[in-house]
UniProtKB/Swiss-Prot annotation:
It comes from Apis mellifera ligustica (Common honeybee). This is Olfactory receptor-like protein HbT9. The chain crosses the membrane at residues 13-33, 49-69. Residues 34-48 are extracellular. One of its GO terms (molecular function) is G protein-coupled receptor activity. The keyword Cell membrane applies. One of its GO terms (cellular component) is plasma membrane. Keywords: Cell membrane, G-protein coupled receptor, Membrane, Olfaction, Receptor, Sensory transduction, Transducer, Transmembrane, Transmembrane helix. The keyword Glycoprotein does not apply. It is found in: Cell membrane. Belongs to the G-protein coupled receptor 1 family.
Length: 85
């Protein structure tokens, strides 16, 4: 069998790039939303926007957190088994 290290490296770089770029896009969009919320003049509108956007940001954060934890756990399990036959 041939070595798959080069393929794994390329795949890791591609996946890492996709994750970083998508995360940056999401963070930038949330920063712009927060900027606009903070510049609202109406207190009622401000609280309504914070309530709506806040819950959405929490859900998206949990989604990424659990995905990251799962990825790190699976990667560490894979590396732990490398020395075994």
């Amino acid at each position: 069998c041939s070595s798959t290290e080069a393929n794994e490296l390329v795949m890791s770089v591609i996946v890492g790039t996709v994750v970083i770029v998508s995360s940056l896009i999401i963070l930038i969009s949330y920063a712009l939303i927060l900027f606009n919320i903070l510049h609202m003049s109406s207190a009622e509108g401000w609280f309504k926007a914070i309530g709506t956007c806040g819950s959405h940001i929490i859900i998206v954060g949990l989604f990424y957190e659990f995905g990251l934890i799962t990825h790190v756990k699976l990667s560490s399990d894979w590396y732990m088994g490398q020395g075994k036959l």
